[in-house]
Amino acid sequence: VKEAANLLTTIVYSNVRKFSVIPGITHFLLGGADTSLHLYDLYADGSITEVDDFVSSGSGSVMAYGVLEAYYKKDMTEAEGVDMAIKSVNAAMQRDSCTGEGIDVYVITKAGMKKAASKKVNTKAE
């Protein structure tokens, strides 16, 4: 997983100053499992941070982090994790117009991947 993170960040960094219809200046979050579970925060400047618990990215991440820090705990149930994800993105959507207006939550396990929730939020003034 670490080598995949290194490869991805090298590709992103090498495209920072090149014109492309495919955005090269992006922020990636990469998770995976080999001998253990790993979560990486990859920046367009080529830096990589391995995180132990949770990570948020984007313009609304400041609001999302408040919820993540309040609700995250080791050994959460799947339902608690999905609820926390929805609450954190919802906090960002309510306070940051660039975050968007919906969320799709997927749960990834050894058995595969499944869609756990899909929610649209009305952020327009009525």
Model-predicted segments: where are they?
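Long, low-complexity N-terminal extensions
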Residues: 1-126
